[in-house]
Amino acid sequence: MRLVHGKDAVNALDVSWLSPILVRDPTSPSESAWDLFATFMRTRTMKSTATNMNQHPTTAQICRRFATRLFRGTVSIRPLTLTLGCLAASASASLVAQETATNAAASQADAISKCPVMGNPAGPNRHTVSGAMGNGDWWPNQLNLDMLHQNSVKSNPMGEDFDYAAAFNSLDLAAVKADIKELMNTSQDWWPSDYGHYGPLFIRMAWHSAGTYRVSDGRGGASDGTQRFAPLNSWPDNANLDKARRLLWPIKQKYGSKISWADLMVLTGNCALEDMGFETFGFAGGREDVWEPQKDVYWGPETEWLGDKRYSGDRDLQNPLAAVQMGLIYVNPEGPNGKPDPIAAAKDIRETFGRMAMNDEETVALIAGGHTFGKAHGAASPDGNMGVEPEGEGLAAQGLGWINTHGTGNAGDTITSGLEGAWTSTPAEWSHGYFENLFGYEWKLVKSPAGAWQWTPTDENAKGTVPDAHDASKSHAPMMFTTDLALRMDPEYGKISRRFHDNPEQFEKAFAKAWYKLTHRDMGPVSRLLGDSVPEPQLWQDPIPEATFDVIGSKEIEQLKQKILATNLTSSQLVSTAWASASTFRNSDMRGGANGARIRLAPQKDWEVNEPAELASVLTTLEGVQKEFNASRKDGKQVSMADLIVLGGCAGVEAAAMKAGHAIQVPFTPGRTDATQEMTDVESFEPLKPIADGFRNYQGHNADRPAEEMLVDKANLLSLTAPEMTVLVGGMRALDTNAGAGPLADLGKLTKRPGALTNDFFVNLLDMNTVWKQSPMCEHFFEGRDRESGNLKWTASRVDLVFGSNSQLRGIAEVYASEDAKEKFVKDFVNAWTKVMNLDRFDVNDSESTETQVAAK
């Protein structure tokens, strides 16, 4: 999706290309060179660069002299600082190009255009802006592997060794909260607070940070602070939240690296609720910031704001999307596509909130609780009054957007959603006024000053019951959105709303728990949560019990591996079962994984991809090993099924490596425990069900994308790099782990030695004596025939062939197909395997894993 920092913002600065540049600078810049650059920058402080060039003719000479030293290598400079300085100069050079076009000083204009620092090619035809033509423009169906390499340490200013958990734990959280609450009660002239309190604005900020989460793929949410970056920082639904974050900057600046933006936004939302009289359920830190826009999140097919091409048929919403329109967090408050129909709006609300992991009661509680505070802003039409979003603004705006020219541009003249007014008579205090007004009045349809549909009481006595946000001499009637009326008019929502109206304590408890779920849903298990305000584990956090026994040691590990290998289970069965257990993990919301051994439980035990009958047989055999071992121990040591399943996979890999001529020890860290069915929300786990698993050459029946794209998507959720994904696929094919029987079992099995951990998959895939053609059996299957005889040699899937077709993946495959790569292949496979097995081991440091050792037999 290139809508914000692509098509609609072709001049948006693209700094992603800086990541490969090393930031280590062993020398210092010469003072004279820096004097030149400083002089150049000082001369650019006047009204425009063009005027500056007229008044200071030596500027171009200074620029050229500095650039000459740079390119001759006599200036040594930290690349990031230099590049940003040059890019800032280049960006403002657009003014130079425009203003010097008619300037009589043609020689000076020519000097500017040729200057290596300020030269400005016409149009977005340069690699430093996102609108430049790239590979994706030439070949739009090219496999996008960038998502596998996002969030590199090279883009992270904190460095590889920064320990955020330790930094957060050193924080005086009470002092932070006190500072936040003081800030909320101190209005700033540049963006005055409504009702003298920034709390409602901060609740919206926290809500919209968390509200992008969708349960289908676990992406979105508050856990990485991406509201700071495109596209979220420029979504229409996030209008003026740039001001909320700027208001918070003094707090962030004071505490620095001890609290991330991601944590600060959620904590501030909690503080806002508390300072306005509501008792929250809890708060946990531990959200670590990312430092770049995320490339793995699909936000929709639209190319314009508020488009709804995501729907088909009878309003069928495309997966994995949850919001109804491009640029909205949830639903359109005016109703579907702006049509004020509360019943139709209820349908959208139910689907959208459901896709964000909320049931009907949680949905009503969240909407009603959130709308107890603050107001909507629609003082005038945005047309002609509202500037562009932050990503489309110029340099002088310094990252702010939606600049408002109506009246004062803020306070009573604020334009945000276009709807106008407050829901209750105490917008800066917790109350039960929302339901009192919702059921206490009859409502009629009106338009806001901005022209948006909203509802006002038919009772004239309602006028004057709501104070003005800024002028004590004014008052208003309450208002409701179409989506608010849906909570009264929809039969199911109506029942819940009336119950909450009649039982305020139930409403308060439901809102507190729903708010906690909303803001913590994507943080994973309780073991990842930091701070002393973390409540007891909730069912939606997929709880795992604490160990009530001593874990096994190295001696017992070796004994158990021998016992497992002595059963009738093959390496393929052991590896497949361990992979099925561990590969449910999603790095997006930290759910799934091998800990808990939920592969034994519904729904995972019944998923088609896990081949239920085969799985049941393997688990029964492993349970026998577990029972025998545990019964024999007198020292308190026990082995869980979660550990035994993973250990079985490790033993299978070792045996397969030995079969290929390599002795290797696969690292294994015990300590997993077994969850129960009562600890497992079946409905909540269904979205973890793989639609496709390219590592097992499995393709489900409801795929919405080519199999190779779904492989990359799964690899991203497993936090794998392209080389790790490649070596795992090659190894899994050699180990004969395909899901399915008959022809499916042989797809991609490009080896005459199945079950041996060889690099045969890559060797045979890249063999030029084989010609590949689509199979008559299925468009997703291919046949590899001998180039001369035409005899069938292999069958393969789209996933298999992409490693020879995609130039980047082929380059990696060539490494593993080389004669000198046999040992490297085994070692790299084991390292990637161990990574996947431990993805959910948040209780284990990376340093606790042993180094993989491999030797020829």
UniProtKB/Swiss-Prot annotation:
Record-annotated active site: H208
One GO location term (cellular component): cytosol
Catalysis: reaction(s): H2O2 + AH2 = A + 2 H2O; 2 H2O2 = O2 + 2 H2O
SUPFAM superfamilies: Heme-dependent peroxidases
Alphabetical list of CDD domains matching this protein: catalase_peroxidase_1, catalase_peroxidase_2
Species in which this protein is naturally found: Rhodopirellula baltica (strain DSM 10527 / NCIMB 13988 / SH1)
Covalent link location (Tryptophyl-tyrosyl-methioninium (Trp-Tyr) (with M-356)): W207-Y330
Assembly: Homodimer or homotetramer.
Positions of crosslink type Tryptophyl-tyrosyl-methioninium (Tyr-Met) (with W-207): Y330-M356
This protein's name: Catalase-peroxidase
Cofactor(s) for this UniProt protein: heme b
BP-aspect Gene Ontology terms: cellular response to hydrogen peroxide; hydrogen peroxide catabolic process
Post-translational modifications reported in the UniProt record: Formation of the three residue Trp-Tyr-Met cross-link is important for the catalase, but not the peroxidase activity of the enzyme.
Co-factor: note: Binds 1 heme b (iron(II)-protoporphyrin IX) group per dimer.
InterPro entries reported in the protein's UniProt record: Catalase_peroxidase, Haem_peroxidase, Haem_peroxidase_sf, Peroxidases_AS, Peroxidases_heam-ligand_BS
Family named by the database record: Belongs to the peroxidase family. Peroxidase/catalase subfamily.
Uppermost EC category: oxidoreductase
Keywords: Heme, Hydrogen peroxide, Iron, Metal-binding, Oxidoreductase, Peroxidase
HAMAP family: Catal_peroxid
